[in-house]
Amino acid sequence: MAKPVQIEVWNPNGKYRVVSTKPMPGTRWINLLIEQDCRVEICTEKKTILSVEDILALIGDKCDGVIGQLTEDWGEVLFSALSRAGGKAFSNMAVGYNNVDVNAANKYGVAVGNTPGVLTETTAELAASLSLAAARRIVEADEFMRAGRYDGWLPNLFVGNLLKGQTVGVIGAGRIGSAYARMMVEGFKMNLIYFDLYQSTRLEKFVTAYGEFLKANGEAPVTWRRASSMDEVLREADVISLHPVLDKTTFHLVNKESLKAMKKDAILINCSRGPVIDEAALVDHLRDNPMFRVGLDVFEDEPYMKPGLADMKNAIIVPHIASASKWTREGMATLAALNVLGKIKGYPVWSDPNRVEPFLDENVSPPAASPSIVNAKALGNA
Ligand SMILES: NC(=O)C1=CN([C@@H]2O[C@H](COP(=O)(O)OP(=O)(O)OC[C@H]3O[C@@H](n4cnc5c(N)ncnc54)[C@H](O)[C@@H]3O)[C@@H](O)[C@H]2O)C=CC1
Ligand SMILES: O=C(O)C(=O)CO
């Protein structure tokens, strides 16, 4: 028997029962659901990560849809329970959905939503922040000041790397990888090398045009190159940022061998998913190469870190906050709620998950569609 969990209820007489496994930022998402006759139940349990049993208890006997989090294990057990309870839709409040077994969802006819686009710039900005913080040793310097160790300017104090004219490498030049590349190229006049399974024509055009602009103004132009292998990026780039999806092809993409291929004083940033890096190998590499620096937002066994990582002065570590701006988090909540609502109401799936702006304008009603359903094709409603 699943144990009861604490909830907060909005619009108790609503016809459709929608459960959110966590309180989410803003109220627009709640209002949009209530306006369409949903009873909204929000889990207010104090524990951060809900177990499958907790979520089973939330789903109960009748549930039309669930908004869940990337920390939860959405597989066979939960999708079968949701389907038994009459549920049509689940949405992650995240763009990444490696915590979701989409095949299991397909088996039970449950739509799986995610929240692309609204977090692109916010996530890229955190990757850029970590790049700068690592290049200029900001966290080490901050700790030094707070410890009362500053006793005057010195020529060698916290000397770091100049980004201008160096090469930024992007692995996974999708929405976020491309946004990050543009920030680093335009903001710091870095040259770009990228690796992705697909060509990023828009990104290439952007760098070409910016290079021409610089040249016309008498400055050295920036350049771009699409690498034919990830190794090329690792060997050549001074700053490397990881932005692929997490799947079988990207698990431990950065491992002992690939770390060795990188420059001794390179900077590695990860705002994608922890398991893209073999974290134990990274700790060894950081220990053996004090000039090598890393900025991590995500960890292999979140919320834990591999032994030794927290002691590394050449690592900057933050707790999975890359999408944590107010506008973005409220927007993610809205998109997740509208994914679920759209399926409940029988709306079509939005035609382009890369263009979700119409759902985010608070001054107008959102389109009658689910913004992003990743298994729409498999369920026959693309
Ligand atoms: N740290 C955080 O808070 C956040 C993390 N993320 C992570 O970032 C990921 C990317 O998000 P978006 O840019 O919106 O997705 P996207 O789908 O636009 O981009 C992913 C890119 O990775 C590429 N890719 C896939 N396999 C690859 C491989 N083996 N080698 C090289 N490239 C490969 C794809 O072709 C695609 O261009 C998400 O799946 C999520 O896991 C996203 C938002 C916030
Ligand atoms: O959206 C995602 O995939 C995250 O990791 C959180 O924003």
UniProtKB/Swiss-Prot annotation:
**Any idea where this protein resides?**
Peroxisome
One GO biological process this protein is involved in is:
oxidative photosynthetic carbon pathway
| Reactions catalysed, as given in the entry | (R)-glycerate + NAD(+) = 3-hydroxypyruvate + NADH + H(+)
Quick one: which pathway? Answer: Photosynthesis; photorespiration; 3-phospho-D-glycerate from glycine: step 3/4
- Where is NAD(+) annotated to bind? 175-176, 271-273, 297, 320-323
Q: What is its EC number?
A: 1.1.1.29
Q: Which GO terms describe its cellular component?
A: peroxisome
One Pfam family linked to the record: 2-Hacid_dh_C
Which InterPro entries does the record associate with it? D-isomer_2-hydroxyacid_DH, D-isomer_2_OHA_DH_cat_dom, D-isomer_DH_CS, D-isomer_DH_CS1, D-isomer_DH_NAD-bd, NAD(P)-bd_dom_sf
Q: Where are the catalytic residues?
A: 273, 302, 320 (proton donor)
Q: What induces it?
A: The appearance of HPR in the cotyledons of cucumber seedlings is both developmentally and light-regulated possibly at the level of transcription.
Q: Which UniProt keywords apply?
A: Glycolate pathway, NAD, Oxidoreductase, Peroxisome, Photorespiration
Q: Which GO terms label this protein's molecular function in UniProt?
A: hydroxypyruvate reductase (NADH) activity; NAD binding
Family from the record:
Belongs to the D-isomer specific 2-hydroxyacid dehydrogenase family.
Supply the name of the protein.
Glycerate dehydrogenase
**What organism, scientifically named, is this protein from?**
Cucumis sativus
From the broadest rank down, the organism's phylogenetic lineage runs:
Eukaryota, Viridiplantae, Streptophyta, Embryophyta, Tracheophyta
Name the gene that codes for it. Answer: HPR-A
